[in-house]
Amino acid sequence: MKKVTINDLFMMKNREKIVMITAYDALFARLFDDYVDMILVGDSLNMSFGGKNETIGLSVDDMIYHTKAVQNGAKKAFLVVDMPFGSACTPQIALKNAIKIYKKTGCDAVKIEGTKEMADTIKLLSQNGIIVMSHIGLKPQMSRFEGGYKIKGKDELSAKSILEDAIVLESAGASLFLLEGIVSSVASEISQKLKVPTIGIGSGASCDGQVLVWSDAFGFFDEFKPKFVKRYLEGATLIKNSLKEYADEVKNSKFPSSQYEYTK
């Protein structure tokens, strides 16, 4: 099975939609690998995997551990790793951490949240051979600072600012973009103006591809569902029903039956 490369993704822009999903371990990465073009080891793991209410709190070593696990399961998909909160606060710190992630995980790219102020950081990383996905629009790592998760591009000033971010960061060397929580018309304009692929989450259908957090898409997190999430499976219900059946069989001495026992 051919490994997806950055050149493959460039070729897909305006030709074929790019499919991306999150993964945090080898088991699910292996399941997803045949059906997606890209896998994101996102800091969303702090929420869906760690049970927190925000992405802040992860370390570079946390991301490395989970990326290694995903790498063990996914052999085809283009693998992107989030730079966690605080790991890219200066260009030199970002370079040091990105090199560490690159060397220890074998990932294909790192993702950095930020506006045009991150241009120097992205330029330095790309000059050192590191592929960068720039994350613009709604930036979860800024949720405390902004007082929550707020959709971007609703007014002319906001829309103009996001478009400027995209153009500046592409010029700095960003090879990919993640557009999150952006009004669809604005995301469409960004995708048309950029030469590199855009992956959307909550940013409409005009992006070059889409990404979802796997536990959202498959219904394993049933406490809250954002507007942009389509559930393709009611996973939590299936697991609960299966677990109830297992528990009932154990309580009533129906499992294990002789079929599942070793004999002389």
Curated annotation (Swiss-Prot):
Required co-factors: Mg(2+)
Note describing how the cofactor binds: Binds 1 Mg(2+) ion per subunit.
GO cellular component: cytoplasm
Chain positions recorded as Mg(2+) binding sites: D43, D82, E113
Pathway(s) annotated for this protein in UniProt: Cofactor biosynthesis; (R)-pantothenate biosynthesis; (R)-pantoate from 3-methyl-2-oxobutanoate: step 1/2
Domain of life: Bacteria
Entry-linked InterPro entries: Pantoate_hydroxy_MeTrfase (IPR003700), Pyrv/PenolPyrv_kinase-like_dom (IPR015813), Pyrv_kinase-like_dom_sf (IPR040442)
Entry annotated with the keyword Magnesium: yes
EC number(s) per entry: 2.1.2.11
Catalytic activity: 3-methyl-2-oxobutanoate + (6R)-5,10-methylene-5,6,7,8-tetrahydrofolate + H2O = 2-dehydropantoate + (6S)-5,6,7,8-tetrahydrofolate
Enzyme active site: E180 (proton acceptor)
Subunit structure: Homodecamer; pentamer of dimers.
Role this protein plays: Catalyzes the reversible reaction in which hydroxymethyl group from 5,10-methylenetetrahydrofolate is transferred onto alpha-ketoisovalerate to form ketopantoate.
UniProt name for this protein: 3-methyl-2-oxobutanoate hydroxymethyltransferase
UniProt source species: Campylobacter fetus subsp. fetus (strain 82-40)
Classification lineage: Bacteria, Pseudomonadati, Campylobacterota, Epsilonproteobacteria, Campylobacterales
